[in-house]
A protein has these predicted regions:
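N-terminal binding-site loop/beta-alpha segment at the start of enzyme catalytic domains
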Residues: 1-16, 33, 71, 143, ...
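Acidic (Asp/Glu)-rich catalytic clusters
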Residues: 3-13, 40-46, 101-105, 126-132
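A short, structured active-site edge motif that brings together acidic residues
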Residues: 13-26, 47-56, 116
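Local beta-strand N-terminus motif with an aromatic residue
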Residues: 15, 45-48, 85, 109
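Active-site mouth loops of central-metabolism enzymes
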Residues: 22-30, 60-65
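CE4/NodB-like, metal-dependent polysaccharide N-deacetylase domain
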Residues: 32-53, 78-82
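Beta/alpha (TIM)-barrel catalytic core signal, keyed to glycine-rich beta->alpha loops juxtaposed to Asp/Glu
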Residues: 55-218, 222-226
Length: 226
């Protein structure tokens, strides 16, 4: 388990930030509580740093997603007050999903994790989150593998003497997002962290944002059969 690996590593648990998500079929108060305990058992942990509702409108709850989310969020709030989770948030939520959640919520989401990468800026969602003091986490900050073949991105990598991945991550930071790059390769993990000793010019930040569709586009969570 993750907890066992942490103990064997000698790393202080407080130095790690661990997130997991509530799966689509587990919405509702009781099922959320059971799903949380199951996750904690699998992880071998006493608490989570962040717990997220993965999807706002799963196909299973398409006709009652507001009620299902409200039940899940009540469970989240209780777990938060009990110290089992240190922060609570959502993922792939659009403004109307959060508005519906806040009709019954006592604690606002602290995080909204959404797909953000060059050419995919989700301006309306980001503006809403900033207005409501919700941290925007960017998953897939490098989009898809297509980003590494986009001429503008390779040109920027050459200009700044960095990798395309580093350009993407740096862009995300300068856009005010918290990027979540994924890798299992130690060298790439180290490289992805080496983005705090340079900055992109404002024109290059804007150019990256304008590359609409270069890595595909996010789909409407209310329409996906997921």
């Amino acid at each position: 388990s993750v907890g066992e690996a942490i103990r064997e590593s000698g790393i202080n648990r407080k130095d790690l930030f661990i997130t997991t998500k509530l799966w689509n079929t587990d919405h509702g108060y009781d099922t959320t509580m059971r799903a949380f305990e199951h996750s904690m058992k699998l992880l071998g942990l006493d608490y989570l740093d962040l717990y997220l509702i993965h999807w706002p409108n799963p196909i299973k709850f398409r006709d009652c997603w507001q009620k299902a989310n409200a039940g899940s969020w009540k469970a989240f709030e209780e777990l938060y007050r009990a110290g089992r989770i240190r922060a609570l948030g959502v993922s792939n939520f659009l403004p109307h999903h959060i508005d519906a959640l806040m009709e019954t919520a006592e604690i606002a989401p602290m995080v909204n994790q959404i797909r953000l990468c060059p050419g995919e800026t989700q301006d309306a969602v980001v503006s809403y989150c900033r207005e409501h003091h919700i941290l925007v986490e960017a998953y897939s900050p490098m989009g898809t593998g297509k980003i590494f073949k986009v001429p503008q991105m390779t040109a920027l990598a050459e200009k700044y003497q960095r990798s395309v991945a580093q350009i993407c991550i740096r862009w995300s930071l300068q856009m005010g997002f918290l990027p979540l790059p994924k890798s299992v390769t130690p060298a790439r993990i180290a490289e992805n962290a080496q983005v705090f000793d340079f900055e992109l010019d404002e024109a290059d930040v804007a150019m990256n944002a304008s590359l609409k569709g270069c890595c595909g586009e996010s789909r409407d969570p209310d329409q996906i059969l997921f």
